[in-house]
Amino acid sequence: MISAVKSEEGRVLIAPFSKNLIGRPYIILKWAQSSEGYITSKGTQSKLSNPFSDTLTHIWRSELDGILVGHNTVRIDNPRLDVRHVSGANPHPVVLSNDTESLRESYIFNQEKVPYVYSYDHPNEMLSDLFSKGIYRLLVEGGAKTHKYFIEHNLWDEARIIRTKVQLDKGIRSPRIQGKRYKSLKVASDTIDYLRPFD
């Protein structure tokens, strides 16, 4: 039993380095979802995770090199993608979009670190380019379309799902993902499940 636990711990520790050896970032998917499994209300921003989970998310951001969101997340949420709740360096913003002109007034296009922008067309080339720019650990924060994009291309190494008790009568369903849960963390009213792909 002890050797099995040690083996699992070792796998988690070396996982980021194993992906770096093949020239792409270690990719962490992260989202919060309602008690019914919705990631957000349709067309509007929805606050789901509690303040303690928010602080933990900012700690994660401070530990990573880049943070990626899709076009709709920028358009609807206008996120800062920074670490304002904790000390540390802001990760470099990355945006997936085929039309950034409509996003130019958003916050992340008017800050010190200019976002790296990519289309949805060539995911492997995008990841290789990010790696060449020093993005060795990448946090994907959404939205649902963007998470689905990475899952369908089998381009994820870890998922951190914040399960909340917030209720949304309707909305956009959270991504469907299959993986092995290797850790679960209770954060006040939220529960965070850590998954990795099946071997």
Each model region followed by its residue ranges:
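Enzymes that bind and transform nitrogen-containing heteroaromatic metabolites
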Residues: 1-199
